[in-house]
Amino acid sequence: GFVALLKKLPLILKHLP
C-alpha cells in the first residue's frame, strides 16, 4: 500500500547520514 511506503520513508531517512 501507499501508506506503508510513507511509513517507510522516515525509516529510510534515519539510515541516511
Swiss-Prot record:
Please give the residue positions where the record annotates the modification Proline amide. P17
Coarsely, its chief localization is: secreted
Cellular component annotations (GO), alphabetically ordered? extracellular region; membrane; other organism cell membrane
- Entry comment describing in which tissues the protein is expressed: Expressed by the venom gland.
Cellular localization per UniProt: Secreted; Target cell membrane
Query: Tell me, what is an example of a GO biological process annotation in this record?
Result: defense response to Gram-positive bacterium
Keywords, sorted A to Z: Amidation, Antibiotic, Antimicrobial, Fungicide, Membrane, Secreted, Target cell membrane, Target membrane
Q: Which family does it belong to?
A: Belongs to the xylopin-like family.
Q: What does this protein do?
A: Antimicrobial and mast cell degranulating peptide which probably acts by forming pores in membranes. Active against Gram-negative bacterium E.coli NBRC 14237 (MIC=3.12 uM), against Gram-positive bacteria S.aureus NBRC 12732 (MIC=3.12 uM) and M.luteus NBRC 12708 (MIC=6.25 uM) as well as against yeast S.cerevisiae NBRC 10217 (MIC=25 uM). Has hemolytic activity (at 100 uM). In the context of inflammation and cancer tests, is weakly cytotoxic to normal cells, induces calcium signaling but does not impact cAMP production.
Question: What is the name of the protein in this document?
Answer: Antimicrobial peptide Xac-2
What organism is listed for this UniProt entry?
Xylocopa appendiculata circumvolans (Japanese carpenter bee)
